[in-house]
Amino acid sequence: MKTIIALSHIFCLVLGQYLPGNDNSTATLCLGHHAVPNGTLVKTITNDQIEVTNATELVQSSSTGKICNNPHRILDGIDCTLIDALLGDPHCDGFQNETWDLFVERSKAFSNCYPYDVPDYASLRSLVASSGTLEFITEGFTWTGVTQNGGSNACKRGPGSGFFSRLNWLTKSESTYPVLNVTMPNNDNFDKLYIWGVHHPSTNQEQTSLYVQASGRVTVSTRRSQQTIIPNIGSRPWVRGLSSRISIYWTIVKPGDVLVINSNGNLIAPRGYFKMRTGKSSIMRSDAPIDTCISECITPNGSIPNDKPFQNVNKITYGACPKYVKQNTLKLATGMRNVPEKQTRGLFGAIAGFIENGWEGMIDGWYGFRHQNSEGTGQAADLKSTQAAIDQINGKLNRVIEKTNEKFHQIEKEFSEVEGRIQDLEKYVEDTKIDLWSYNAELLVALENQHTIDLTDSEMNKLFEKTRRQLRENAEDMGNGCFKIYHKCDNACIESIRNGTYDHDVYRDEALNNRFQIKGVELKSGYKDWILWISFAISCFLLCVVLLGFIMWACQRGNIRCNICI
């Protein structure tokens, strides 16, 4: 009879009709964490691809396609380069005394005056761009014995001949060109930028017809520097009907210093000075349209948001911009490790804890409880552990941005042909910096992701251990993130476990009694040995029946002949 009872008990267990803990005297409580059907793969220090519930993209890979005019003051060069505006090309007169944070040069810009070159073009362009102003002050230079205000048909201002408005072309007066020696002190408390030039005629005849002397000379000095230029007479490629050229030079005069100009011909004299300012203004080549909008970061492709720490839109930037990296994507984990919920668990879909899988549909928290008791099933989030994890993760993105955003601009680098080796070195340095930052960015994100996953796992374990300490011997760890509670635990009891007010002493006697009864069937009542012996006997009996049946079948077919001898 005891054997029959034991077999009946086992049969009920298999079919799930009588599960210890599923009756009114027991309950099951599982701890779990949030999960989503399709997570996001991120990289950590220990794993190239690990799935998390949520992640934030850190690389800005696209621009708005337009340059925002706020908060930076943008000056659109339109048809003018910065140097043409500086010299006073007639079609750039509208830029006189302009100011800017960023001067935007267009690919369609052109010169429309006397052909010129600037031996140190990049330095002059960068100097004026960083000053952020074309403020010009006219000074009373005295040029005695020469003709002033020379002009050319190649540089029309209105219907007649013209010239650069910031320069004064000096030629012979009657048949003489005396030696010029002019000084101009700087009695102000700021630097002054003087632009001057040297005319290179195309022929000797042009040289003498303009300056009398067969060869001129221009010397410009300060206490700190001196430049002497000898004109190079000779024909050059024709530009706007001219084969002669003007070379543009510049001199900075510090406060208390003196500008000295000495020449016996070929001088393109300054009319005054540009007031130099220090600042973070800059210049950028771009064909992106300028629009009314707000953006702190500008690239030649257009403005980009600076709410991400990295960007791969363009190396050239202006403003507070994300750091340029080579990667197209870097994802920062802002959620926990994702273990999608299994669709079926066991014969009747019993609940399971975090060790087996996560829980989908937990919209009110990252961590929580599920239970089965005499009143049914239920689920609730644990807001305290959820908030503890969120508080530590929320600041991650801002901290990464603070570490990486540049509060300065990366200007364009230009070099003349004779500075080719310097240009190559500069390119190598910039490429090395980008490689280094790209590596640092990947490492930084991997470290942060590792910390996030470890942190969220730790919060889950803390909640589990807290629950274990409350239940003590009143429940058994089922090994999958669940506890089998060996006493009647209604919804109020479950709530007390969740909020930390559970008193295990109240249920201790009931739990011990139920534990003994349930475990007795399994281990203490002798049923285990009976079950083993009965299973062995039945197996042997079935084996004998099968063997005997085979022998009888073989005898009937004549495959086996049995002789009985007496």
Swiss-Prot record:
The keyword Isomerase does not apply. InterPro entries: Capsid_hemagglutn, Hemagglutn_HA1_a/b_dom_sf, Hemagglutn_influenz_A, Hemagglutn_influenz_A/B. Binds to sialic acid-containing receptors on the cell surface, bringing about the attachment of the virus particle to the cell. This attachment induces virion internalization of about two third of the virus particles through clathrin-dependent endocytosis and about one third through a clathrin- and caveolin-independent pathway. Plays a major role in the determination of host range restriction and virulence. Class I viral fusion protein. It is found in: Virion membrane; Host apical cell membrane. GO terms for cellular component: host cell plasma membrane; membrane; viral envelope; virion membrane. Palmitoylated. A lipid is attached at C555, C562, C565 (S-palmitoyl cysteine). The record marks R345, G346 as: Cleavage. The gene is HA. Major glycoprotein, comprises over 80% of the envelope proteins present in virus particle. One of its GO terms (biological process) is virion attachment to host cell. It is a single-pass type I membrane protein. Residues 17-530 are extracellular. Homotrimer of disulfide-linked HA1-HA2. Disulfide bonds join C30-C482, C68-C293, C80-C92, C113-C155, C297-C321, C489-C493. This is Hemagglutinin.
